[in-house]
Amino acid sequence: MKVRASVKKMCDKCKVIKRRGIVRVICENKKHKQRQG
């Protein structure tokens, strides 16, 4: 899980979603997991 100021899709399978006011990226590739913070 990477914590970043700006979350971006890193590949085609990445999805940007918002959970409880936190912007997250979920992906099949574990290295692409991110959240904003």
Curated annotation (Swiss-Prot):
<keyword id="KW-0687">Ribonucleoprotein</keyword>
<dbReference type="GO" id="GO:0005840">
    <property type="term" value="C:ribosome"/>
</dbReference>
<dbReference type="Pfam" id="PF00444">
    <property type="entry name" value="Ribosomal_L36"/>
</dbReference>
<dbReference type="InterPro" id="IPR000473">
    <property type="entry name" value="Ribosomal_bL36"/>
</dbReference>
<dbReference type="GO" id="GO:0005737">
    <property type="term" value="C:cytoplasm"/>
</dbReference>
<dbReference type="InterPro" id="IPR035977">
    <property type="entry name" value="Ribosomal_bL36_sp"/>
</dbReference>
<keyword id="KW-0689">Ribosomal protein</keyword>
<comment type="similarity">
    <text>Belongs to the bacterial ribosomal protein bL36 family.</text>
</comment>
<protein>
    <recommendedName>
        <fullName>Large ribosomal subunit protein bL36</fullName>
    </recommendedName>
</protein>
<dbReference type="GO" id="GO:1990904">
    <property type="term" value="C:ribonucleoprotein complex"/>
</dbReference>
<dbReference type="GO" id="GO:0006412">
    <property type="term" value="P:translation"/>
</dbReference>
<dbReference type="GO" id="GO:0003735">
    <property type="term" value="F:structural constituent of ribosome"/>
</dbReference>
